């Protein structure tokens, strides 16, 4: 409901709104009227290939965190070059992950809409693809610390 309220405010403000398609991925839902002839269209749950294709074709996204651990969708969107709005939660702030992430402390619908408008007003047809946060993308040993934990636990057994 929060994101829908923000999208409705953004639709009211965005001058070139007819140029934008607004999608929702995840749980399937009926289309949602956002005003000015625009609808939030559900694409439902996507395969990994469909998800990657959607990210490749997207310019902006919103993915809010609802728990203190980092949410993967904002990270995934950002490495695909999508400008993504997310929020801080407790001690988590993803703003330093890369320059495609806009991390908000204030997630009121009007504040989200304002940030989305800024992003969309700076739209460029061709978005240069840069390797952002290469360590995150290439790290083959993400859970290297598990070996150390096992050694500690085995010592105590």
Regions found by a protein language model. Name each.
Residues 48-51, 112:
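Acidic, amphipathic alpha-helical patches
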Residues 107, 121-157:
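A charged, aromatic-enriched C-terminal amphipathic alpha-helix characteristic of glycosyltransferases
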